[in-house]
């Protein structure tokens, strides 16, 4: 038995399959500081506790794009490790804010499969949902990717 995760191939997916991604992630001050430093983001809501409180938050929420990247990354080993390309994203929403100290987890459901005419790959459609430690949905999106098959014709 190999300890290397080979990821899922097109044939490994089935419509309705629910994937609980194994790793949770607690958002740290370091995550937020590095994100702001690397991106140059200066949205006042995400950079200032005072402004966040003036806008009705107890503390500053993290940037939604950072939330997307932290949560989306949880799905890579299970869904897109064998992707030829991520083809698209749709219906992205951030229903609830995420704060430093929150722990997020991710589940994905396969909602569609379409074998490509080349016989070497197929498109996998998934609906992914990220939740915080209280079960509140913090990220909801659909994506589709071109995924390799185990055997190429």
PLM segments and residue spans:
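Hot-dog-fold acyl-thioester-processing enzymes
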Residues: 1-88, 150-153
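Mid-chain, well-packed structural core segment of small domains
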Residues: 82-87, 91-100
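HotDog/MaoC-like acyl-thioester-processing domains
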Residues: 1-15, 98-103, 107-153
């Amino acid at each position: 038995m190999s300890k290397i995760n080979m990821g899922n191939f097109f044939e490994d997916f089935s419509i309705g399959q629910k994937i609980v991604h194994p790793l949770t992630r607690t958002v740290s001050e370091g995550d937020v500081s590095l994100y702001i430093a690397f991106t140059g983001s200066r949205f006042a809501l995400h950079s200032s506790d005072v402004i966040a409180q003036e806008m009705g938050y107890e503390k500053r929420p993290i940037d939604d794009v950072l939330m997307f990247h932290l949560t989306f990354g949880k799905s890579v080993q299970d869904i897109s490790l064998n992707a030829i390309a991520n083809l698209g994203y749709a219906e992205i929403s951030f229903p609830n804010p995420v704060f430093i100290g929150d722990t997020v987890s991710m589940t994905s459901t396969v909602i569609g499969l379409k074998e490509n005419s080349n016989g070497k790959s197929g498109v996998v459609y998934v609906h992914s949902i990220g939740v915080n430690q209280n079960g509140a949905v913090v990220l909801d999106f659909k994506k589709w990717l071109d995924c390799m098959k185990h055997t190429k014709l």
